[in-house]
Structure formats: C-alpha cells, structure tokens
Amino acid sequence: MKILVTGANGQVGWELARSLAVLGQVVPLARDEADLGRPETLARIVEDAKPDVVVNAAAYTAVDAAESDGAAAKVVNGEAVGVLAAATKRVGGLFVHYSTDYVFDGTKSSPYIETDPTCPVNAYGASKLLGELAVAETGGDWLTFRTTWVFAARGKNFLRTMLRLAKEREEMKIVADQFGAPTWARSIADGTAHALATAMRERAAGAFTSGVYHMTSAGQTSWHGFADAIVASWRAVPGAAPLAVSRIVPIPTSAYPVPARRPANSVLSNEALKERFGIELPDWRYAVGLCVRDLLSQ
C-alpha cells in the first residue's frame, strides 16, 4: 500500500511517517513538495503518485492571524483540501483529513458529537469547516478526524510555549475558563494508523463508509490545568533543568484579549471512533508526561 502524507514536517505529519510505516510505503511530502497555498499544483502530485491513501496533515493553523488573513486560510484549509480529495478520488484512493473543535461555537454544556450543528466563531474554524465540506462533496472514500489542542515535542504548540515561559518567568497567567482535551500528535498518528488499517479492510470487503469522527485524548481540562500538568511533568523527570515559575495563576478569557474568539467548550466525544474502529486515545495527562520525556530525550 502506498500512502502519501502532506504536511510531513508538521507535528502530526512527522509522527505519521513513523506510525503509517507498518501499513506500507509512506511518501512524506513537506510544504516545498506539496504546497497547499498553491492548490493548482496539487492534483498533478496525487495523479502522478497514484497512492492508495492520501493523508492530509497540512493546514493553516495560525488562529489569530487568520482573522486578518482569512483568504489565505480559506485557500489552504478549504480550496486546497478539496483539490486533494478530488484527485484522490480520481486515482481510486482513500482520503484522510484532520479538522478541529473550532468548527463548533463552544456553547454546548456537554461533549460535542459528530452530528452536532457546526457554527465556527472565528476565521480559522470557518476555513476548516470549508475543508470538511469540500472533502464530503467529492463523493469519494474519505475519513475526517476532528481533534483538539494538539501538542508535540517539536513545532510551535502550547506545551513548548509553556515550558519556554516557565524557564523565564516566576509567574504565568493562563486562561482557566476554556475547556478541551490536550491531544498528543503521536496519539493522533497512532490512532490514524489503526483506523486506516480497519478502513482498508472495509474497502477490500466493499463495506466502507465515509464519515467524520472525533479523535482526542481521554479526559478534559482547561488551558490552566494543561499548563499546570506540563510544569509538573517536567519537574517529575529526574535531572530536568530547573524552572523559574512558582505561580500559575488562573485568569478568565476576558483578561487575555486576542484577535480570534475561542470556544469555551472544545470537548469532543470519542464514542463514535471507539464504536467503529475500537480506538481509545490515552488520557491527556499520561500523554503530556510521555511527550515531556520525549522532549527531554532530544
């Protein structure tokens, strides 16, 4: 099986190169090889490679920048995704895509399920919803996995930012009234590999159905709780460099103004993923501990 992975240098893409290798030949494509900012170049790449699977891990992820650069976000997260999905259909392949909790408005009091109405509250979320719709409209075989609060030992993410600040500051003020499930990029990649193995068996048996599924860590917390766990995990590792921070202060969203509005509730239900694919991602606290150790080992 030949698997094309776009966004191969990103947090999830980097992990996919490892997790998908057990399923077949992985062809990782970095941005300079498959630039979603240039949708007109993408169909040729897929059609020339003729993969069995295309996994799109590339995205425009600058949430605040998207408020003033919405056109670029729509091209990368919307138009380009549709081009990739359509090209994958033409070569008879399966298209796998990632989306976000930000397609919801965050007003629900319980975890979101896949069929809840979408209502993005920022430009980034709107662009990701465009991508979801573009994939579905191709009529091909596809899977879209929505995830939340992605972190990794590499790249730009909340975990790495918190550790940098914790080394520099005695006090950090972190938002405590937004809730979600911090999800390790490695967990997403491993979950994708398991789901893909099942999906390919279903396709071979003529029993495959396309759909959207939520794929996040077990459990939930606030950004403040996430930051607290990151610092605690670092300090729990023998020999880890000392951190300057002594106080992590909870603050409301209103005390940390940013260009893009964030959903208050980003918790997604993973029950549909478990039911179809038998997948349960580890608890977010456990994943944070493993990721911190991974970072320290580099």
Swiss-Prot record:
Gene3D superfamilies membership: NAD(P)-binding Rossmann-like Domain, UDP-galactose 4-epimerase, domain 1
Residues that coordinate or bind NADPH: 11-12, 35-36, 59-61, 98, 124, 128
Listed InterPro entries: dTDP_dehydrorham_reduct (IPR005913), NAD(P)-bd_dom_sf (IPR036291), RmlD-like-bd (IPR029903)
Gene Ontology CC: cytosol
Reaction(s) catalysed (UniProt annotation): dTDP-beta-L-rhamnose + NADP(+) = dTDP-4-dehydro-beta-L-rhamnose + NADPH + H(+)
EC number annotated for this UniProt entry: 1.1.1.133
Cofactor(s), by name: Mg(2+)
Active site: 124
UniProt: dTDP-beta-L-rhamnose binding residues: 100-101, 149
Binding site for NADH: 10-12, 35-36, 59-61, 124, 128
Major enzyme class: oxidoreductase
Keywords: Carbohydrate metabolism, Lipopolysaccharide biosynthesis, Magnesium, Metal-binding, NAD, NADP, Oxidoreductase
Molecular function GO labels: dTDP-4-dehydrorhamnose reductase activity; metal ion binding
Feature type site, description Could provide a fine-tuning to achieve optimal pKa matching between active site and substrate: 100
Cofactor binding annotation: Binds 1 Mg(2+) ion per monomer.
Biological processes, Gene Ontology terms: dTDP-rhamnose biosynthetic process; O antigen biosynthetic process
Pathway as given in its UniProt record: Carbohydrate biosynthesis; dTDP-L-rhamnose biosynthesis; Bacterial outer membrane biogenesis; LPS O-antigen biosynthesis
Family: Belongs to the dTDP-4-dehydrorhamnose reductase family.
PANTHER family: DTDP-4-DEHYDRORHAMNOSE REDUCTASE, METHIONINE ADENOSYLTRANSFERASE 2 SUBUNIT BETA
Functional summary from the UniProt entry: Involved in the biosynthesis of the dTDP-L-rhamnose which is an important component of lipopolysaccharide (LPS). Catalyzes the reduction of dTDP-6-deoxy-L-lyxo-4-hexulose to yield dTDP-L-rhamnose.
Quaternary assembly: Homodimer.
Protein name per its UniProtKB record: dTDP-4-dehydrorhamnose reductase
Organism (species): Burkholderia thailandensis (strain ATCC 700388 / DSM 13276 / CCUG 48851 / CIP 106301 / E264)
